[in-house]
């Protein structure tokens, strides 16, 4: 498994070039409206979306666009992660967390893919990054953070879909665990 996309911008450009990303240029409220649109797109295996003018809680338009549904299908997620089948990413992660040292001692060449993946993962230190081009005072209310559901306790930065597999039955569970 190699990570095929090194930056979010490259991934979004790829999606847009392939007709898998739409842009909404009209203002869209980050409380419920953006989430409802993304929910419909996910349920219909639709394209990724960029809200170019997300409307914040105070009614102002954020200068920062909001991207949603960028991993909205299994195929899109596998492509983003450079995987050829659905279990590859999980299998590689398990292999990295619990490598079979005995197998590697007998057949050292089997460790090469694992070593390649591990070496590709460490952070790279840079003096300046693209994220430092825009400087602003810290104010989280100025970020287009969605509030997705009416009973949510607030706006959540993360909304991951976590897939787990029961080791006995093999059944899968899809859950959301947010911060």
Residue ranges and their predicted role:
Residues 1-179:
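Extended, highly charged
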């Amino acid at each position: 498994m190699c990570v095929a996309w090194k930056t979010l911008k490259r991934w979004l450009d790829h999606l847009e070039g392939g007709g898998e990303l739409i842009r909404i240029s009209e203002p869209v409220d980050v409380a419920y409206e953006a989430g409802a649109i993304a929910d419909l797109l996910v349920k219909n295996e639709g394209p990724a979306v960029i809200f170019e003018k997300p409307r914040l809680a105070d009614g102002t338009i954020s200068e920062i666009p909001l991207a949603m549904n960028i991993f909205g299908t299994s195929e899109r997620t596998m492509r983003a992660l450079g995987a050829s089948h659905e279990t590859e990413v999980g299998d590689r992660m398990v292999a990295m967390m619990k490598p079979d040292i005995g197998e590697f001692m007998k057949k050292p060449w089997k460790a090469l893919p694992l070593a390649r993946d591990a070496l590709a993962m460490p952070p790279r230190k840079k003096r300046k990054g693209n994220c430092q081009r825009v400087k602003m005072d810290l104010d989280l209310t100025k970020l287009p953070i969605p509030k997705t559901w009416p009973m949510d306790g607030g706006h959540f930065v993360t909304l991951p879909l976590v897939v787990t597999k029961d080791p006995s039955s093999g059944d899968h569970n899809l859950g959301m665990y947010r911060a």
